From Swiss-Prot:
Site (Plays a critical role in the stabilization of intermediate cation): 88
Keyword vocabulary terms for this entry: Lyase, Magnesium, Metal-binding
Catalytic reaction list: (2E,6E)-farnesyl diphosphate + H2O = (+)-corvol ether B + diphosphate; (2E,6E)-farnesyl diphosphate + H2O = (+)-corvol ether A + diphosphate
Organism, as annotated: Metarhizium brunneum (strain ARSEF 3297)
Signal peptide start and end residues: none
Name of the featured protein: Sesquiterpene synthase MBR_10393
Domain statement: The Asp-Asp-Xaa-Xaa-Xaa-Asp (DDXXXD) motif is important for the catalytic activity, presumably through binding to Mg(2+).
């Protein structure tokens, strides 16, 4: 009933565009990185059918990496691109585009955590586990130990808060906005992504700067901007998913707003968060801070602008013409 009410309002839905006051960047290695990423995904058996391969080709995850980490060294950028294609596919096939919970859900998610904790794959490995192990071992080699642990902790929280997201979808109605924002902050995968922003620019930030309250606020604002914008941009396809579909927009609609009004309310929050991010970023960079921290803040800006540009210019992940074929992965 909830999905039917929302679906009935989709045909007239207007999706806003977002802008930020800094230019976009893109690595000049983008196409090479994309091609290698596809080859890597094929070698690790992530592209389960020709249909699925074609979907990944038009989604352009390598371009997302190139836009969000434009200054990264080629080896690190390749590892990040491979990580992104793995993450999107694992998130779709383990959580989002399948049944809310399956017999394999716990095994799949705990296997991902075990790779981080134990640095080995299980026997037999679950889908994507060997690819994930390969990505993690490359990042362990390329990053300082503490920097890798920031990434790893973000991924552990993705796997564990996925369970909270599943619980929310087993309820007849969604949890409230505060609880949703907590879940979204971690199931998005943004924290491990932003944890790589410093290494991809001027090197890893020392812990005393990385965990500064204002810096962590900037990281959280970056997460919010990307996640809440995505809640609007992915709305049409997510409503058709068999598993996860509740997000900020649908919660506002659950509270009584029309779907269009819920989109506008969410967009207003995105724009306010962008303004707050800009104000705080200017204040932090006006202080005497390290080059590495300057690089991290630049990296957060690259992520915000890079994601927004990827949606507008590169990817067909959320395109209307592929909703019918892409929203439901149970056949895979």
């Amino acid at each position: 009933m909830e999905k039917q009410r929302l679906t009935a309002q989709l045909s007239s839905l207007r999706v806003p565009l977002f802008s930020v006051p800094w230019p976009g960047q893109c690595s000049n290695k983008a196409e090479v990185i994309e091609a290698r990423m596809m080859k890597w995904a094929d070698e690790h058996n992530l592209l389960v059918t020709d249909e699925y391969r074609n979907r990944v080709i038009r989604t352009r995850y390598g371009l997302l990496a190139a836009r969000c980490y434009p200054n990264a060294g080629e080896e690190l950028l390749q590892a990040i691109a491979d990580c992104l294609v793995w993450f999107f596919l694992a998130d779709d096939l383990f959580v989002d585009r399948v049944e809310v919970a399956t017999d394999e859900t716990i095994r799949n998610l705990t296997a991902m955590v075990d790779v981080l904790d134990l640095n080995v794959a299980g026997s037999p490995p679950v889908f994507g586990e060997l690819a994930w192990l390969d990505v993690c071992q490359r990042l362990r080699r390329l990053l300082q130990a503490e920097a890798f642990e920031r990434f790893a902790q973000g991924m552990r929280l993705w796997a564990t808060t996925a369970a909270l997201q599943i619980l929310n979808h087993l309820r007849p109605t969604s949890v409230g906005m505060r609880e949703y924002q907590t879940i979204r902050r971690h199931t998005s995968g943004m924290n491990p992504c932003t944890s790589l922003a410093d290494a991809a620019n001027k090197g890893s930030v020392q812990a005393c700067e990385f965990y500064d309250a204002d810096v962590q606020t900037l990281v959280r604002q970056t997460n919010n901007i990307v996640c809440w914008a995505n809640d609007i941009q992915s709305l049409r396809i997510e409503i058709h998913q068999p598993g996860q579909f509740r997000n900020m927009v649908t919660i506002y609609a659950q509270q009584g707003q029309s779907l269009q009004d819920a989109v506008e309310t969410t967009a207003t929050r995105v724009n306010k968060e962008i303004a707050s991010f800009c104000e705080l970023a200017d204040a932090v960079t006006a202080r005497p801070i390290s080059d590495e921290l300057h690089g991290l803040i630049d990296g957060l800006k690259y992520w915000i602008r890079g994601y927004l540009d990827w949606v507008v210019h590169d990817t067909l992940r959320y395109a209307d013409q592929f909703i019918e074929s892409d929203a439901d992965d149970r056949r895979f």
